[in-house]
Amino acid sequence: MAGDSRNEPMFCEEGSSESGYVLCVIDSLKKKITSDRFVYIQKRVEENSIKLSPITLHSHNLSKNRQTSTSNSTDLVSNLLTKRKEDALCAVNSRESSPDESEGANCQDECSSTVIVGGNLSARNSVRPIRLPEVATLPPYTTWIFLDRNQRMQEDQSVLGRRRIYYDTNCGEALICSDSEDEAVEDEEEKKEFKDSEDCIIRMTIQECGMSDAVLETLARDIERAPDDIKARYEILQGEKPEGSSKKVSELNVKMEDVYGDKDLDAALDSFDNLFCRRCLVFDCKLHGCSQDLVFPTEKQAPLCSSDEGTPCGIHCYKLVSKPDAIMEIDSHLLVDVEEPTSDNLKDQIGSNKKKLGSSGQKTKSQQSESSSTARVSSESSESEVQLLSNKSPQHSPGLSKNKLGAKGGIKKSTNRRIAERILMSVKKGQQEMSPDSNSIVNGCHWPRDMKLRSDTRSGIKDSVVSSQCNSPSTRSFRKKGTLQMENNSSFVDAQSDSMEDTNNEHSATDGCDSSRKEECVDESICRQEAHGRSWKVIEQGLLLKGLEIFGKNSCLIARNLLGGMKTCTDVFQYMNYIENSSASGALSGVDSLVKGYMKGNELRTRSRFVRRRGRVRRLKYTWKTAGYHFIRKRITERKDQPCRQYTPCGCQSACGKQCPCLTNGTCCEKYCGCPKMCKNRFRGCHCAKSQCRSRQCPCFAADRECDPDVCRNCWVGCGDGTLGVPNQRGDNYECRNMKLLLKQQQRVLLGRSDVSGWGAFLKNSVGKHEYLGEYTGELISHKEADKRGKIYDRENSSFLFNLNNEYVLDAYRMGDKLKFANHSPDPNCYAKVIMVAGDHRVGIFAKERISAGEELFYDYRYEPDRAPAWARKPEGPGAKDDAQPSTGRAKKLAH
């Protein structure tokens, strides 16, 4: 049967329509699947029967042997069932009776309080039960998740539209909490999963008949699915092919770097923009969620400048390659024999140099060629080549010393500088042509201590050389000092100048050759820089743009923070030099022009800041009234218990007007908004001195806000010893005391049995009045969600809801911290306060009075009068004031 079904051809008559042909194919597939299923089941039944036969045979033999042994045995004890029946607990077969009624009554009383064990025994065993002392049960405890910061409720945790079931302790059963039948949720249709047989029919039918609307509709009618579902299922089945799957994964891993390399920075950061929270600076923020609206600030911060610019960042730092250390080493080797000459051997050296003047010309030519090659090698910008320069220079230094000392005195002092320039002209000129930005390099780097000059003559010559390259104020001071030092050694330098004038003709003969070689070096350097610039990918250029925007022209910080593993510090420095060199010829385009624009913009911005600092400081009159907008001042002065407004950053690209979302919502613009700092609606922080932020004179404290180090002038946070570029720590007198929630400087709170009700929160250490104890954390839910959850909380006689602002309520039932167990009291020792911290409203618990260690914490829940439970209502008195607002929902805690 199975064989006939397999060999049955899947075709129909030629005259049948397309739908009939599809039905014919489906029927044939069903028959084939049914026959295969029948064969498979029959085969499994046979296999299971073979496996089961030894087990059943063994059990049958055991039962037969047991029955034989029981029938042959005459001992009644062997009958286990009879023995257990006779020895059953509390079974009494014989009991002594007494004619005396009083004794019978006593016996009954005794038997009622005892348990008799054993029936056919000669003596009865009685056990008197012992009553255990009653122990108070633990109060109800809810399993909860600890939260150190608030978290927005997940969508699947909502109770809206769901049946709420609670346990009623009075009747001892679970009940459904529902106000009306409308809240009953209809049962959702179970999603049918595709079976293996259906997958086979879909795959084989589409492969046989093709994918068309008629085929999909026919399959949908036969399988009772939607055509779109069938089409999606077929695509899934096609994608689940194991063939070549491992090869595809390996190809994806190999090409992953190339895929990101071809994209620009915005495309590569698309997913990061959705996941990264720019307010909390974390990924997958639980408070603000993902896919936030991107707000681009109008004003950007100035680039970060590193204070330790002279220290190399690593072995690939440009400071170890591009600064003229190799030139300084050449200078030291060239002048090693000239250092500190004496008057005794000076005449001998002059005489010997006059005799060897003829041979010195050839040596000078070789020296000039070596110097030109040295200049070409020094432009390679690598550490190994710098070491080669230091090894080559001592070989030709004796010849130079002999040529320099064979001349007479009598030349003017002004020739000293010209002598030094002639000695190193071939080295310096090539270096200047190939690196036009050497001035900025020298100015931005500090000379090493081991390169200090050890004599007056050497310092004078080297200072004159440096003066030809850089014009900084420090270089000018060295130039003046070097001139005075060279005046003291004028006789020695005059002799040097005569020898140089004698060999001037030989030098001029080699200048033409040197200039041609220098031009070749420049051309090679330019070609190398162009090839280096073309090797940069689009994403690397985008990261460089972002690095210039953040760190300025600091190659070390850009390579370390943004281009790690892609480009080194030297690569970044050379690419920026290539951009500057190419900008002069106007050959820039695309990203290169943007890089040049950012580099110029940073220079102009830094220059303008420097000019402003030189001017007179303008002191503005700053009071607490200028800190925020008028509605904030109105709330500060009137101290009305108005609900706080939820803050949402605005994306205004200019000064906010009447259409600003912050202005229409009734909130101030914060640092997260896109508007400039001069916006009139922006909260400007405080200018309090030292620790004066805990009084109402502080605008932040008066507006129920914490100070922000980015906004307030004197309220900042310092850490470390200043080595990382941040200010040092100050004493306690300079610490701002209005940043407790921001810095999480809470007290230690313990959890224990409360003397009032259930569990309670206790303080570990003593604190003073108005000290910050901790934060009341929980889930951020809507007011509608809070009303739904509050029905259960009210019936369970518990309260974990806390009003936060006009949009959210804090619920600490499932998630929170230990302060959720602080009980209510009409005469509390703590108080709750809603404070805005970095744009978010948070609830802080503060000490209302001095609290000793181990004391339980209480605060007034401040329930609304018509919603407060009986245990939380204040006793009515003749002088009681009702200052609460009418309620619109379930019982929720309120802050002061």
Swiss-Prot record:
Reaction equation(s) it catalyzes: L-lysyl(27)-[histone H3] + 3 S-adenosyl-L-methionine = N(6),N(6),N(6)-trimethyl-L-lysyl(27)-[histone H3] + 3 S-adenosyl-L-homocysteine + 3 H(+)
Enzyme Commission identifier(s): 2.1.1.356
GO MF assignments: chromatin binding; histone H3K27 methyltransferase activity; histone H3K27 trimethyltransferase activity
Ranges of residues in domain SET: 747-862
Biological processes annotated in GO: cell differentiation; flower development; heterochromatin formation; methylation; regulation of long-day photoperiodism, flowering
UniProt family annotation: Belongs to the class V-like SAM-binding methyltransferase superfamily. Histone-lysine methyltransferase family. EZ subfamily.
Name of the protein described by the UniProt record: Histone-lysine N-methyltransferase CLF
